Amino acid sequence: MVMGLSVVFVCIVCCLFTGLFMMLSEKRGLDREKCSPYECGFEPIGSARSPFSIRFFLVAVLFVVFDVEVVLLMPFAYMFFYGKSVLGILSSSGFLLILFVGLYHEYREGSLEWVG
């Protein structure tokens, strides 16, 4: 009980000090140097803000999401090899169903079409 209260007390004190320091700190405006892009110490040549394809960004995000989900499927393969429990099979089937529903939604939305 004492340990739990001490952790809560330390968190409250940290939050109070953080708020106090934020209120008392000096506010500085952004100058031109802070807003300019940094290019290895050299003066920037041209604009660093090049146009970026939103379609490519969406495909990259989808790749990362589905790649992480494939990594989350690895324990299910281990479970199928060493232990065959009904709960494990149902949970992995539910996870795969959610994966395929998400993939179907992205397909129907048109996010997987590169040209369109």
Curated annotation (Swiss-Prot):
It is found in: Mitochondrion membrane. It is a multi-pass membrane protein. Its EC number is 7.1.1.2. Keywords: Electron transport, Membrane, Mitochondrion, NAD, Respiratory chain, Translocase, Transmembrane, Transmembrane helix, Transport, Ubiquinone. It holds the Pfam family Oxidored_q4. InterPro entries: NADH_UbQ/plastoQ_OxRdtase_su3, NDAH_ubi_oxred_su3_sf. The keyword Transmembrane helix applies. Its main location: mitochondrion. One of its GO terms (molecular function) is NADH dehydrogenase (ubiquinone) activity. GO terms for cellular component: mitochondrial membrane; NADH dehydrogenase complex. It catalyses: a ubiquinone + NADH + 5 H(+)(in) = a ubiquinol + NAD(+) + 4 H(+)(out). The chain crosses the membrane at residues 1-21, 56-76, 85-105. Belongs to the complex I subunit 3 family. Core subunit of the mitochondrial membrane respiratory chain NADH dehydrogenase (Complex I) that is believed to belong to the minimal assembly required for catalysis. Complex I functions in the transfer of electrons from NADH to the respiratory chain. The immediate electron acceptor for the enzyme is believed to be ubiquinone. This is NADH-ubiquinone oxidoreductase chain 3. It comes from Mytilus edulis (Blue mussel).
